[in-house]
């Protein structure tokens, strides 16, 4: 039995969240009656309203009246009035991942997991399958520029989804094809230990059916170790590693783009194949690796070399992934979601490859607990930045932790040899600081998962106003 067509209304608590909004949009496009609520107005809320979805701002018990099912994410607290009302009225309450799993049961599915790179890789797989006329349904964790949204309903038999590991619910997703980009210590508030994180990713791959396959990056030592532990499943490895089944070769930066080739090795048939002259309109080794994962899936599903080559060259990117928001006096302003040390290092390396002048990083640390648990890593991930501007920690609902704040982070960076580290007193002061240190050709990269994206879009205009 699958999700009945006549069920509804389906009420989403926190419908404006990036994961929730995508599922709500696809359900709406499938013909289900969808409604929801969110704590505040947002671009996602506005977009869903344009599709005819009724959305209330603020959480109230009466919002769930008449609903047949209530969908919640892990961000919703147990004392949320809508959740309490749903349970009091015996309305079924399901987690976001459970509803996503119901949608996935309607299609053959590619699920993309990993500590970093999920959103970009999901977008790349979607772009390649689009080009191959698969017309996939897509549910992503970021806004795909080609769609102007993070979700779309396709008429084809395939679905491409981002698998969020943060709360462990990605293990509920019935994927036929799984991608694992990397595995790093993250979300330890849920998993408690890094060993538990690794075990979850192992289970994710082993959930793939015998007729499916997993694509795993063996440039990452933890993923390489996982490959050796997984039995009875078909694994396709990728990376620059000479042992990879799908190998990234001859990677060269080309301004804000990358060129490379990919070599395939079929161990069973003992054959080799190569796709040369690949161009990706994004900088950075990490993005080339993400593209290699997408190419591995596309090749396995039968796309031609020319289709892969053209689709990759035309890839439009993802919002908040090395997104240029504007420029001033020859200075490029970049917005990026990077908020983990591994992500920050990769983004700054890409910026370094894109300019011959300075890279100026502006970082808004995200969550006190993350800064505390990875403090040493944060102090050593800015090596490709000539200057680091540090904002206050974005709490994301957390209480402050003594000694874990902007000023101690500044001291930590200086203690690790950074010569120019500037504490930002308030967001309104950012334009003045950048104006005083940036020169033509420089890249100013704003990093974080909080509201720093708003600063990134405002900064070009503020700089122009200063002259």
Swiss-Prot record:
What Gene3D superfamilies does this protein map onto? Mur ligase, C-terminal domain (3.90.190.20), Mur-like, catalytic domain (3.40.1190.10), NAD(P)-binding Rossmann-like Domain (3.40.50.720)
Question: Where is the protein localized?
Answer: Cytoplasm
Q: A single GO CC term, please?
A: cytoplasm
What InterPro entries does the record tag this protein with?
Mur-like_cat_sf, Mur_ligase_C, Mur_ligase_C_dom_sf, Mur_ligase_cen, Mur_ligase_N, MurCDEF_pg_biosynth, UDP-N-AcMur_Ala_ligase_MurC
Task: Name the residues that bind ATP.
Answer: 114-120
Tell me what reaction this enzyme catalyses: UDP-N-acetyl-alpha-D-muramate + L-alanine + ATP = UDP-N-acetyl-alpha-D-muramoyl-L-alanine + ADP + phosphate + H(+)
* Predominant place of localization: cytoplasm
Q: Pathway, per Swiss-Prot/TrEMBL?
A: Cell wall biogenesis; peptidoglycan biosynthesis
The answer to whether UniProt assigns keyword Cell wall biogenesis/degradation to this entry is yes
Q: What does this protein do?
A: Cell wall formation.
Q: What is this protein called?
A: UDP-N-acetylmuramate--L-alanine ligase
Q: Which organism is it from?
A: Rhodopseudomonas palustris (strain BisA53)
Its ancestry begins with:
Bacteria, Pseudomonadati, Pseudomonadota, Alphaproteobacteria, Hyphomicrobiales
